[in-house]
Regions:
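Hot-dog-fold acyl-thioester-processing enzymes
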Residues: 1-56, 111-134
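Hydrophobic beta-strand-centered segment that forms part of the acyl-chain substrate-binding groove
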Residues: 36-87
Length: 134
């Protein structure tokens, strides 16, 4: 599964050096991930209805080139099949040239909302939707 979304960098995402503040790339990745999850009817609201939360447990980010105010960017989100975690890879690209601005990966673990216990394998229906071989 993969999804691409477009974002035009707003002024309020810039830092004092006039480039996108590094933490806002995480926000862009979240928007991409939510769009991909919505495509497979697994929004965070649906996850909660099934009794699970999926906090991010690891995140790796590599900043390649800064995004600028008004720049049209693409957030490409790719799901990596796994039986234990929700794993997503991201590329943030310049929309005009497709040059890489940022690459990243997140890993999310299922947590039972009632007991707050970690699940070391994806529970159903998440295993059917997101599991599989790497």
């Amino acid at each position: 599964m993969e999804k691409e979304i477009e974002i035009i960098v707003p002024f309020y995402d810039l830092d004092p050096m006039h480039v996108v503040w590094h933490g806002n790339y995480v926000k862009y990745m979240e928007r991409g991930r939510c769009a991909l999850l919505a495509d497979c009817s697994m929004t965070y609201e649906n996850m909660e209805k099934h009794g699970y939360a999926f906090p991010v447990v690891t995140m790796r980010v590599k900043y390649v080139k800064p995004a600028m105010f008004g720049q049209k960017i693409i957030v490409r989100t790719v799901h990596v099949p796994d039986e234990n975690f929700l794993i997503f890879k991201y590329e943030i690209l310049d929309a005009a040239t497709r040059s890489k601005l940022c690459v990243a990966e997140t890993k999310q673990m299922a947590i039972d909302i009632k007991t707050h216990e970690s699940c070391f394998q994806l529970p159903e229906p998440f295993l059917t939707t997101f599991g599989g071989t790497k």
